[in-house]
Amino acid sequence: MSKANLLHTDNNMKITLFSEVSVGISANSILFVVHLCKLLHENKPKPIDLYIAFFSITQLMLLITMGLIAVDMFMPWGRWDSTTCQSLIYLHRLLRGLTFCATCLLNVLWTITLSPRSSCLTKFKHKSPHHISGAFLFFCVLYMSFSSHLLVSIIATFNSTSDNFLYVTQSCSILPVSYSRTSILSTMMTMREAFLIGLMALSSGYVVVLLWRHKKQARHLHSTSLSSKASPEQRATSTIMLLMGFFVVLYILDTVIFQARLKFKDVSTFFCVKIIISHSYATFSPFVFICNDKYMIKFVTSMCGRIVNV
């Protein structure tokens, strides 16, 4: 079989990947539960809480799916059939795309929410949840269509000696795809991702400019020293910038590893490193929300206190 078959013998990669998935599932579960409680207990729940809850459940499903795929990569208990391979890998690819999309739309919604009344975005404040929902539904259909080729190209691996397939797990492989088809799919994915990253960059830049103007006006109006405590706007801005910076860095690393993997003909180490990097955002992004939200900090602290007392 291909070198990818040696994955199950690499204990370091196995431990790293399963640790990442476990931490990510725990963090996203906490983030989802906290914002679900907010939505259920508040009289007028904020749209941003709804989208953070959705963002966390999408990442949670992504990591659970990755965990199932990782089991077949490192600890195969039995061969999957083609239907199982196609369903899980298609769902995983779809959830990765939706996580990308949810990150972008959450960034845009936060920008609209933080914009002042004098801003040109004020008219979108009441309509933004509906527009964001419509945009997400559109991207969901788009990602489903982009990933539909996997339902044909993914098969169960029956011939363990063939070098013509690109091995995904011990049970699943990808059929060879023509160069023209690969080029078309790559171009479409690049355009889609460039658009979303550009939208994230614009919204993040807009928030930074707004915050800078706000601080400048505050210094002008109050000559006395300002409070050292960060305002909700400042905490929200730092959250946006941290998420944006973390996302871009991991996206660049993921692209570099992907190109290296193609150059070195699917070396198992590059394959596994790419998987770890491509799921790092889903694992660690919840901690950005947890560390920048007072409600989240109180919830986690009280929960840890109860566990210690037990």
UniProtKB/Swiss-Prot annotation:
Any one cellular-component term (Gene Ontology): plasma membrane
Pfam families: V1R
Keyword terms, alphabetized: Cell membrane, Disulfide bond, G-protein coupled receptor, Glycoprotein, Membrane, Pheromone response, Receptor, Transducer, Transmembrane, Transmembrane helix
Superkingdom of source: Eukaryota
Spans through the membrane: 17-37, 51-71, 94-114, 135-155, 194-214, 238-258, 270-290
Tissue spec. comment: Expressed in a subset of sensory neurons located in the apical layer of the vomeronasal organ.
Extracellular-side positions: 1-16, 72-93, 156-193, 259-269
Record protein name field: Vomeronasal type-1 receptor 50
Gene (name only): Vmn1r50
